[in-house]
Amino acid sequence: MNKKTISIILLIIFLITTILTLANVFLDDTNSQENQTGTLTVDNKTIHYEKAGKCLEVIDGNTIQVYGVGRVQLTQVGSIDNEPNFSQAKNFVSEKCLGKTVYLDIDDKQPKDKYDRTLAIVYTNDTDINKELLNSNLAKVSYFTPSEFKKGEV
């Protein structure tokens, strides 16, 4: 075999290994708590969540893709393209959620929006993501009605 053939074979092996590794990281749910209800303590408050899953993608500052759930809209949080803090909001959500298990307190009165995204307060092990975005002025309150959550309560 010549050097070019060997290089191509090594490149293919490398690409296959990389793809399998990434698939394992994002899709391995042997130790996850996906789609299980439960409780979580955040800021000394006991939180009830309806679903949990690994965050596979951050779409923007208030929308994520969760394994086993689909697209999730952070309820009461507005992060609009081309707004001054849009990039910072997306970066914050990426840092806190991407590749990690997130816990969803789904809005019981309106579980989906008009785009079929699940409406929820999103938690990590120690952070209320919705609340942190608002408290950090990275997003504005965007209220959906009806809602189990009171306006500004997040």
Regions found by a protein language model. Give the residues of each.
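Small beta-barrel nucleic-acid-binding modules, primarily SNase/OB-fold domains
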Residues: 2-154
